[in-house]
Structure formats: C-alpha cells, structure tokens
From Swiss-Prot:
<dbReference type="GO" id="GO:0005829">
    <property type="term" value="C:cytosol"/>
</dbReference>
<feature type="modified residue" description="Phosphoserine">
    <location>
        <position position="14"/>
    </location>
</feature>
<feature type="compositionally biased region" description="Polar residues">
    <location>
        <begin position="156"/>
        <end position="174"/>
    </location>
</feature>
<dbReference type="Pfam" id="PF21389">
    <property type="entry name" value="CASTOR1_ACT-like"/>
</dbReference>
<dbReference type="GO" id="GO:0042802">
    <property type="term" value="F:identical protein binding"/>
</dbReference>
<keyword id="KW-0597">Phosphoprotein</keyword>
<dbReference type="GO" id="GO:0140299">
    <property type="term" value="F:molecular sensor activity"/>
</dbReference>
<dbReference type="InterPro" id="IPR049479">
    <property type="entry name" value="CASTOR1_ACT-like"/>
</dbReference>
<dbReference type="InterPro" id="IPR027795">
    <property type="entry name" value="CASTOR_ACT_dom"/>
</dbReference>
<feature type="binding site">
    <location>
        <position position="273"/>
    </location>
    <ligand>
        <name>L-arginine</name>
    </ligand>
</feature>
<feature type="domain" description="ACT 2">
    <location>
        <begin position="262"/>
        <end position="322"/>
    </location>
</feature>
<dbReference type="InterPro" id="IPR040778">
    <property type="entry name" value="CASTOR1_N"/>
</dbReference>
<dbReference type="Pfam" id="PF13840">
    <property type="entry name" value="ACT_7"/>
</dbReference>
<dbReference type="InterPro" id="IPR051719">
    <property type="entry name" value="CASTOR_mTORC1"/>
</dbReference>
<comment type="similarity">
    <text>Belongs to the GATS family.</text>
</comment>
<keyword id="KW-0963">Cytoplasm</keyword>
<dbReference type="GO" id="GO:0034198">
    <property type="term" value="P:cellular response to amino acid starvation"/>
</dbReference>
Length: 331
C-alpha cells in the first residue's frame, strides 16, 4: 500500500452562525468560482453549533479575520492511502483503521478525518509529520507530493527521538448520539455546479430548519442540521440528509448504484479540541473489527461517523458496550 502526503497545507476554522453574513461573498467565491481562486482544498461543514471550514493557504487568504472566525493554531497536512497507485474508492475509514489510525493513536498523533465520495483524507499536524513517517514507514511506501509529482520518502529505521507506542491510561470515553436523519453521500460534475448554485446557496446560507421526517416523535427521534460540501482538487463531494436532497435536481446528483442511505454517530458531549489522540481510533477500530464501512467527518467541535442505515443499531450497540467496558476499567 502507498501513503501519499499531499501538497495542501490546511487550516481548520470555526465560523459562528451569527457571522455567516460577513463571509457570504468569499464563501460563494470558493464554492462556485474556483477559477478565480488558487484554492485547491476547500471543505465546508454545517453542524448545529457552527460551520467548520478546512481550507488550504490560498483559501485561508480569502477569509478576513473577525470576531466570528475562530482559527485552530496548527497547520495540517493531508494524506490518503492508495492501492497500486489508485486511490481506494470504497467508504473506507474502517479499511485504514488498523494500518493508519490505530498506530498513529498509539504514538500520540492527533488526527482529523475528512471522508468524501471519492476518498478518505487523513489530516495530521505539520509538526507531527516526522513521527507519522516513522510510525507508518514499515507498513507503507510513503510518497510526498512536490510540484505535483510523488517523491519517495524514506523512513528512518532508528527510533531515537521518537515516542514509542504506548498503551497508557484508557482513552476518554466520549458520549455518542445518533440523530434520526438519513444521509446521502453524493458527487456532482463540476460543470453542472452552476445549475444547482441557487439551491446550494439556499441550503447552506438560508435554510436552517430541522428536516420534516423527524420533526415529530419521541425524545430520541431528533434530527440535526448537517451538510458537508467539499471541492478538493476539482472533485466535489456532498453529504446531506435525504430530505434536503429532495430540493436538488435528481438527475445532477450522482451516487453509488445502490443508492445507499447512511445514519450518523455523533461523537462528543463537549467540544473535543485538537490535542486528544485516539478519538477516531475509538470509533474506527470497533467498526473495522466487524467490517462495517464508515465515512468519517471531523469538525471543529465534534466528530461524525456515517454508517449504513441497516447497520446503525448494531453499531450503536457495539460502541456502547465498548464505552461501558472502558468506563468499568476506570478507578
């Protein structure tokens, strides 16, 4: 397997909802006018709390500082895994759980995940790159993009100066929730983006109501606003709930032949921050053990895993039992 360290240097930001009006123009430019920006990595995710932005340095320049914009300190590098030179197409954070996610957690490397229709991006802090390479060099052929070309990276076999894998105190047990939304993971031909621009602007900037399908019901029958759009190296990926999808022309949105729907597992009771290690591993590991596919989207405050709709009960049961097991080990 190959691990590719891409050229993007990404900043992670939180845009408060009351400040959205201030950023409408630069966001529309990044969304719909990529030819007028040199930004090659753009991701915008709406959650109940805020909007999370992941943008490269060129995109970051488009966003003026304000009291509404919170910027994480670190610069993040972007990686993905490929087999025989082609990026893995399956919904696959679980496919890299053992080979990438778990080893990095054991070496205390904090990661963010951004799964898209096309691939799974792994984000690590720039300052952690040497540890990442050292940790994964035995498992992967590692390449770093320079000027658009992959250049082999050789890992130093010596362990001097690098932290050893540790199985110390049990990780923090973060609560999980499962909103009732049913989600679609879609793509769109960039040439047809203008045809959905009006609808996309309405959904992102003006529509914040709870989807109808779960507006009624018991206390557990709740939905959340969640919409993720990414435009990365010319490829578009969209995650939206099934109710929102009805607003878009059905002939322009592309999905897998199965048309599978996904349910969400939301991780975190309080904002997770960026320093804790192993959060993704806590979810990806148990799902990999039972071979459940998952998309995974990290945001500024919380993490989100999407699993096949017919697997949600099994997944919740597995994760809750794991949490109970960890909690019982605490003194």
């Amino acid at each position: 397997m190959e691990l590719h360290i891409l050229e993007h240097r990404v900043r992670v930001l939180s845009l408060a909802r009351p400040g959205l009006w201030l950023y409408t123009h630069p966001l529309i430019k990044l969304l719909f006018l990529p030819s007028r920006s040199r930004c090659k990595f753009f991701s915008l995710t709406e959650t109940p709390e805020d909007y999370t932005l992941m943008v490269d340095e060129e995109g970051f320049k488009e966003l003026p500082p304000s009291e509404f914009l919170q910027v994480a300190e670190a610069t993040w590098l972007v990686m993905n895994v490929s087999h025989s030179g082609s990026v893995v197409q399956a919904a696959g954070v679980t496919k890299i759980a053992r080979s990438v996610i778990a080893p990095l957690a054991e070496h205390h490397v904090s990661v963010l995940m951004l799964s898209t229709y096309q691939t799974d991006f792994i984000l690590v802090r720039e300052q952690d790159l040497s540890v990442v390479i050292h940790t994964l060099a035995r498992e992967f052929q590692i390449y770093r993009e320079v000027g658009g070309e992959p250049v082999p990276v050789t890992g130093d076999d010596s362990s001097n100066g690098f932290p050893q894998a540790q199985h110390g105190p049990s990780p923090t047990v973060h609560p999980i929730q499962s909103p009732q939304n049913r989600f679609c993971v879609l793509t769109l031909d960039p040439e047809t983006l203008p045809a959905v621009a009006t609808t996309l602007i309405d959904v992102l900037f003006y529509s914040h109501s709870v989807p109808k399908e779960a507006a009624s019901g018991g206390p557990e029958s709740t939905s959340i606003p969640f919409f993720a759009f990414s435009l990365i190296e010319g490829y578009i990926s969209i995650v939206m709930d099934a109710e929102t999808q009805k607003k878009f022309p059905s002939d322009l949105l592309l999905t897998s032949s199965s048309g599978e729907l996904w349910r969400m597992v939301r991780i975190g009771g309080q904002p997770l921050g960026f320093d804790e290690c192993g959060i993704v591993a806590q979810i990806a590991g148990p799902l990999a053990a039972v071979d459940v596919s998952a998309y995974y989207i990290s945001t500024f405050n919380f993490d989100h895993a999407l699993v096949p709709e017919d697997e949600i009960s099994c997944v919740i049961d597995i994760l809750q039992r794991r949490q109970e097991g960890l909690a019982s080990k605490d003194p």
